[in-house]
Amino acid sequence: IEVPQERIPGIQRVLIRKCILAKKPVIVATQMLHTMINNPRPTRAEVTDIANAIYYRTDALMLSGETAYGKYPVEAVKTMTKIAAQAEKDKLEENDIRIPLDENSNDVTAFLAKQAVKATSKLKIRAIITDSYSGRTARNLAAFRGKYPVLAICYKEKTMRHLALSYGVE
């Protein structure tokens, strides 16, 4: 899509929000550490892009050319890991994209998922454990972007692979 460059950050945030609201995985992947194809260190702008993707609570970050044909693939992965880990520590809950629960919905799974995530902030809960045959329950829990991990017990390997991209699901 061709858009003026100054609109890209706003459009990215809108698209991330739409994916979260639709309970779809969000992957940010465009030139995250592009300069590390030829240089051992990223630019400050690249570092900020990675941190912002974490602050927006995306499900996954992805490298491409940096690891496919770059001169510093291991360094690129280590760099992204360090930046993401620090951003996870620094993120502020008040900046989260909140998902409202549709009051007119009869979706019991979404209702229970929202309440479970809310409970983690009020009770001494450090994880949410769920079984997940199709992945739907775990994805609902992930969509509400809780502070603590969702431990999904899966019955099918395919479900486990699909959930690997979901925010906070282990």
What do the predicted segments below correspond to?
Residues 1, 49-73:
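Glycine-rich phosphate-binding active-site loops on the catalytic face of alpha/beta enzymes
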Residues 3-31, 35, 146-147:
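Helical hairpin unit composed of two closely spaced alpha helices linked by a short loop
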Residues 12, 67-90:
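C-terminal helical cap(s) of enzyme catalytic domains, especially alpha/beta-barrels
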Residues 21, 79-117:
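Long, charged amphipathic helices and adjacent flexible linkers at domain junctions
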Residues 26-30, 54, 61-63, 150:
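Hydrophobic faces of well-ordered beta-strands that scaffold small-molecule active sites
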Residues 29, 64, 70, 89-99, ...:
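Flexible, glycine/charged-enriched surface loops at secondary-structure junctions
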Residues 34-56:
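Catalytic cores of alpha/beta
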Residues 139, 145-170:
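Nucleotide-binding motor/catalytic cores of P-loop/tubulin-like NTPases across gene-expression machines
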